[in-house]
Amino acid sequence: MRYIKTISMIALLFSFSVAEDLPLGSSIPMADIKMKDINGRQVSLNSVKMENGLLVNFTCNTCPWVIKWQDRYNELAKASQKNKIGFIAVNTNAGKRDRGEDMKDMKKFAKKYGHDFLYALDEGAKLASAFGAKYTPHIYLFDGNGKLVYRGAIDDNPAKRKKVKKYYLMDAIKAVGKDKSIDLAETKAFGCSIKFPK
């Protein structure tokens, strides 16, 4: 009986299906799905995409790793803008909307950290599921043709900005802006697991 209960609990835990991580070269998934941002606007990935591409940052308000990386978010958004790459942060913790991850919390969080970029809510974590995203933060960078050219982490040291040695995402942004190949197109994303709805 205990064995059956254990199996049932495991089945329940994995009842929300998440796709495999989006392969490099893939097109933007669910590019036209509408999401509400903290300013009340309806936005889609296609509406955010610019001439040279799109950067999607799956993030949240409550993950300690996200908070550690906050001092780099605006810089990355500005670099994206400079290189004609659209930038959007997407709150995908649909399983914690009542615990610090609803729209009101997003507005407070953005104000606290001085966000200067789009921050939208992923209803039901549908977008994150389509991407196969599993962590916050989890980065996906697309080129001007809407093809995935980088995925993974922001850099190699979330805890201390001054000790970063490898600027994975910044290097990728600059390469895309200059229409050059990315030296390291895939890194291991790490952070908190996305809280998908049950």
Would you name each region that the model predicts?
Residues Y3-S15:
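Sec-dependent N-terminal signal peptides
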Residues A19-N46:
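N-terminal "domain-start" segment that seeds a small globular fold
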Residues N46-I67, I173:
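Short active-site neighborhood of thiol/selenol oxidoreductases, capturing the structured segment around
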Residues M50-L54, K82-F87, G114-L118, G144-N145:
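Loop/turn elements at helix/coil->beta-strand transitions in domains of secreted/extracellular proteins
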Residues C60-W69, I139, C192-K195:
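Short, thiol/selenol-centered motifs that function as redox-active sites or metal-ligating centers
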Residues I67-K112, L121-A130:
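Structural microenvironment flanking redox-active thiols in thiol-disulfide oxidoreductases
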Residues H115-F117, A133-Y140:
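Structural micro-motif
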Residues L141-K198:
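Thiol-/selenol-based redox modules, centered on thioredoxin-like
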